[in-house]
Amino acid sequence: MEKLLWCLLIMISFSRTFGHEDMFKKAFVFPKESDTSYVSLEAESKKPLNTFTVCLHFYTALSTVRSFSVFSYATKKNSNDILIFWNKDKQYTFGVGGAEVRFMVSEIPEAPTHICASWESATGIVEFWIDGKPKVRKSLHKGYTVGPDASIILGQEQDSYGGDFDAKQSLVGDIGDVNMWDFVLSPEQISTVYVGGTLSPNVLNWRALNYKAQGDVFIKPQLWS
């Protein structure tokens, strides 16, 4: 009997953390500062990227307190192959291949925030959207290729592939609606995603998410519509 219960517990744990789960209207909650709590995402496609778009929601009270990681995509050749990072001086850092550009914001909203970031290698053009509104386009790492077999982490910034976390860069708050495509979304498509559309994401799909949660991470209903 004990052996049967143990097997059932293993099966439940496995399906919860490694299966493709529909996360519709759900969010990952990181309730406290930590260097051990994070969510690892497994991409549907593990190929190199010459174009991509990442969109997500996050909600935190840290924005005026300290900097923190929003999205960390490390490869074996570069721990910051794709990085979205909030700086407490009212700037988002967007990085590709270790190179970075920054986007200033005029005010810090005390509300859930939706962001989309896209990049294409052929031109180096970066687009960064906050709550459905675009910032001025910038140029970054023209001709670069993002590496394959990524380690994708929510809640922490990777200083090495899959690790070397710093609690002072951790997210405290909620994150959800994390979707990623291997192409640049058009302005019309960004608007669709902002109001809740998904457009069949083919790298990370929030409606069929393959993830593993580690530490104090909880799944709760989203606090945004």
Swiss-Prot record:
Signal peptide residues are: 1-19
Please name the GO terms of the biological process aspect recorded for this protein, alphabetically: acute-phase response; negative regulation of lipid storage; negative regulation of macrophage derived foam cell differentiation; negative regulation of mononuclear cell proliferation; positive regulation of gene expression; positive regulation of superoxide anion generation; regulation of interleukin-8 production; vasoconstriction
Tissue specificity annotation: Found in plasma.
**Which Cys residues form disulphide pairs?**
55-116
Q: Which GO terms describe its cellular component?
A: extracellular space
Q: Which cofactor does it need?
A: Ca(2+)
Give every Pentraxin (PTX) domain span: 24-225
Q: Which InterPro entries match?
A: ConA-like_dom_sf, Pentaxin_CS, Pentraxin-related, Pentraxin_domain
Residues that, per the record, bind Ca(2+) 2: 157, 159, 169
Co-factor remark: Binds 2 calcium ions per subunit.
Lineage, top-rank taxon, reads: Eukaryota
The record, for SUPFAM superfamilies, names:
Concanavalin A-like lectins/glucanases (SSF49899)
Q: Name one GO molecular function term.
A: identical protein binding
Give the UniProt keywords, A-Z: Acute phase, Calcium, Disulfide bond, Metal-binding, Secreted, Signal
Q: Which residues bind Ca(2+) 1?
A: 80, 157-159
Q: Where in the cell is it found?
A: Secreted
Relate the assembly described in the record: Homopentamer. Pentraxin (or pentaxin) have a discoid arrangement of 5 non-covalently bound subunits. Interacts with FCN1; may regulate monocyte activation by FCN1.
- Family the UniProt entry places it in: Belongs to the pentraxin family.
Tell me the protein's name.
Answer: C-reactive protein
- What organism is recorded for this protein? Mus musculus
- Protein encoded by which gene: Crp
